[in-house]
């Protein structure tokens, strides 16, 4: 019996041991190990995406030589665990300082294109150029220049014609640049807003304000109606007051339009930095988190809307967006309470992150603005965040990860439990000083978050996460072209249902590419879902485009889904342009463990069979001996 027990213990250890093809490396900190990424120290990270369609993230960088920038990409080699340069499609910018960078397939030809905002070093003017990749010449061609543009443009698939558009500010107006099969068209932003001025009473008051930053501008479903909304950070050029605008997506005249109600316009305190959108408390509604500048505090704005849902219904079928007509009298729901800072009160809204006030948020506004990066590092299904702090005494910067913790609220929340962050639940990286930007990466492509640091010396550094988490994960991506992994949609929503260990069911939410217009954001294309220790499958997984013409085409449901895997989903418009076709590929990860686990199971079963055979033979031998001893007196 002891031997059998030992075999089961050994088998359990084999199944739960964390295997890695990376050897133990020096510079361990909180279970993270640094290793060389093979990227030169004169290169700056610009963007993460999958260049070569191998289902792994690559990195686009800008390498400086004197006043010239060479934009190139490094392909991740998962076997060697390094990046290898692909120098065949370089783009050289002469006398240009890059301010903003976006990579995607803009003209829908399955080749990657760039939108680059830069300062011309000869004239100090800001322009934005669109570079389209020409597959015949195997090079990038500058197709359009937005002259004297604001640097804060962003990309979203607004409207009803299934195409990425560039939203920018120029000559006192918000404008939209869109691509057709033959040309590039510039439209006024007003073409995309609702004509119902009774309900949308803020449309004509704020639609021409400049943008504060593209990092905060987002295209995502804020009210849970399965249609994406525009979230815009703006300012009044006359008063310099900052605002948050939430333009709700609606159907009007068989088109998608955007409606700005006056009670979804929020004035922002100048002490608030660039906000991040995420679901803090995992109630399937998106919240907003602001860093408070020159402090170590954050402001959490919880979404006031809640999900009304029965587990047997189709969520999007029962949560449809508004359809407005000229006579519509519906009201637009208020999404947030006013954003009020109380720096002297560490309540659940204004959260002090560190004990020592000498540590404040690091904000390199000209190059890498302060931005909180949220992902679930410990896979407990709640988002944690990564940022950099500056020590006013030592003049050095340090990355820190803050883990989400459960907090009980007062009676104003009717006893509900929300999430916040604690000074005592952190990963610190004090040995990594003078870091400019820190962000998440997934080197092993297994849903477990690794890190990339970019330091003051211009070195891009990789940290491999060797912590072991006893939980499940899921990753998914929605593409608008088949097997084109840089053709990812912005702001796609993934809702999924699981059952907790205690038997209660819950709906969770994650989004892909919520905010990634400025290079300082450096976010991954996938939506990463930490499932925690729920049941071993996702009962209902619904992916929502948020941009398609009719609500019935807007989403697709899959059930059940295996965790520790990735869903690759794409939709195409049928030839008759009346129906959207969806396709899904399920990739079970991590594949590197599979052969070892299968071998372990075979060995374990073989050992158990041999051991059982041995016990059976031993028992027969003992029975024979006992029988001989029993019948010996009679048979001599």
Feature locations, PLM:
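Beta-propeller blade repeat segments, especially FG-GAP/WD-type strand-to-loop junctions
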Residues: 16-31, 68-88, 124-143, 173-190, ...
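Acidic/hydrophobic-patterned starts of short beta strands in beta-sheet-rich repeat architectures
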Residues: 53-63, 108-117, 160-169, 224-233, ...
């Amino acid at each position: 019996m002891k031997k059998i027990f030992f075999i089961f213990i050994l088998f359990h250890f084999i199944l739960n041991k964390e295997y890695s093809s990376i050897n133990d490396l020096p510079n361990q900190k909180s279970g993270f190990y640094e290793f060389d990424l093979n990227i030169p120290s004169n290169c700056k990270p610009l963007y993460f995406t999958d260049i070569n369609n191998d289902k792994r993230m690559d990195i686009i960088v800008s390498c400086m030589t004197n006043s010239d920038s060479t934009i190139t990409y490094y392909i991740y080699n998962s076997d060697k665990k390094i990046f290898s340069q692909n120098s065949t499609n370089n783009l050289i910018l002469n006398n240009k300082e890059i301010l903003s960078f976006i990579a995607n397939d803009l003209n829908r030809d399955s080749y990657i294109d760039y939108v680059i905002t830069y300062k011309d070093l000869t004239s100090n003017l800001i322009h934005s150029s669109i570079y389209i990749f020409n597959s015949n010449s195997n090079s990038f061609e500058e197709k359009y220049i937005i002259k004297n543009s604001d640097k804060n443009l962003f990309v979203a698939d607004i409207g009803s014609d299934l195409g990425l558009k560039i939203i920018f500010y120029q000559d006192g107006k918000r404008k939209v640049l869109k691509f057709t099969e033959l040309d590039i068209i510039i439209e006024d932003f007003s073409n995309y807003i609702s004509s119902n001025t009774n309900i949308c009473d803020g449309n004509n008051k704020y639609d021409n304000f400049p943008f504060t930053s593209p990092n905060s501008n987002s295209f995502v479903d804020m009210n849970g109606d399965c249609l994406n909304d525009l979230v815009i950070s703006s300012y009044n050029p006359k008063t310099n007051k900052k605002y948050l605008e939430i333009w709700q997506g609606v159907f009007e005249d068989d088109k998608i339009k955007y409606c700005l109600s006056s009670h979804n316009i929020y004035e922002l305190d100048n002490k608030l930095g660039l906000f991040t959108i995420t679901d803090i408390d995992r109630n399937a509604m998106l919240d907003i988190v602001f860093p408070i500048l020159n402090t170590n505090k954050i402001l959490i704005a919880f979404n006031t809307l809640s999900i009304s849902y029965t587990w047997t219904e189709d969520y999007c079928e029962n949560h449809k967006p508004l359809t407005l007509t000229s006579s519509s009298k519906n009201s637009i729901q208020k999404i947030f309470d006013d954003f009020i800072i109380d720096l002297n009160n560490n309540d659940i809204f204004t959260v002090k992150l560190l004990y020592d006030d000498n540590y404040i948020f690091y904000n390199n506004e000209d190059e890498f603005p302060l931005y909180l990066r949220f992902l679930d590092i410990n896979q407990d299904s709640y988002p944690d965040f990564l940022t950099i702090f500056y020590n006013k005494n030592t003049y050095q910067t340090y990355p820190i990860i803050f883990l989400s913790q459960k907090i009980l609220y007062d009676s104003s929340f009717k006893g509900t439990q929300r999430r916040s962050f604690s000074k005592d639940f952190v990963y610190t990286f004090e040995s990594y000083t003078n870091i400019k930007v820190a962000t998440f990466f997934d080197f092993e492509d297994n849903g477990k978050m690794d890190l990339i640091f970019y330091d003051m010396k211009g070195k891009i550094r990789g940290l491999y996460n060797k912590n072991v988490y006893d939980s499940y994960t899921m990753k998914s991506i929605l593409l608008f072209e088949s097997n084109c992994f840089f053709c990812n949609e912005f702001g796609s929503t993934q809702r999924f249902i699981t059952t907790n260990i205690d038997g209660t069911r819950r709906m969770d939410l994650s989004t892909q590419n919520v905010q990634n217009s400025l290079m300082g954001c450096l976010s991954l294309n996938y939506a990463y879902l930490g499932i925690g220790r729920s049941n071993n499958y996702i009962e209902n997984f619904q992916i929502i485009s948020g941009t398609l013409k009719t609500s019935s085409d807007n989403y697709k449901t899959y059930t059940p889904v295996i965790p520790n895997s990735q869903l690759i989903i794409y939709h195409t418009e049928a030839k008759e342009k009346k129906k959207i076709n969806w396709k899904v590929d399920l990739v079970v990860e991590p594949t590197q463990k599979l052969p070892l686990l299968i071998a372990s199971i075979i060995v374990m079963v073989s050992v158990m069979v041999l051991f059982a055979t041995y016990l059976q033979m031993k028992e027969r031998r003992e029975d024979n001996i006992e029988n001989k001893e029993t019948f010996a007196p009679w048979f001599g």
